[in-house]
Amino acid sequence: MENISKIKSAKLGGLKSQFKLAPAVRMPVTFEEIDKNNPREAAVLALFYPDKDNKTCFVLTERAQYKGVHSAQISFPGGKIDKKDKDLSATALRETEEEIAVTDVNLIRELTKTYIPPSNFYV
């Protein structure tokens, strides 16, 4: 529980921190520059759970193979916002249920949006 409290209160690094880990070819941009591209919205869930030894693990999935830019990539469960989703948290929960059949989830917090240029998604 102590770690959850720390996660809830930790300062987010924001867009600046994301570019520290981005490929060198991805130039830093501002939220305003990203918004000019009219990105589509999506959400993912970083799902943490204890293993049999009570060590913290998290879920990754492998995307299906198709002719898109994210074919067969390793990812968090998630996907595009749907008109019936009330917000991005609802999107992440719905997509997680669809992809890995997990329904009993306690959300801790949202993180800074991440822009994915190849598919023009804000996640």
PLM regions with names:
Residues 1-75, 80-123:
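N-terminal leader/linker segments that precede catalytic domains of diphosphate-processing enzymes
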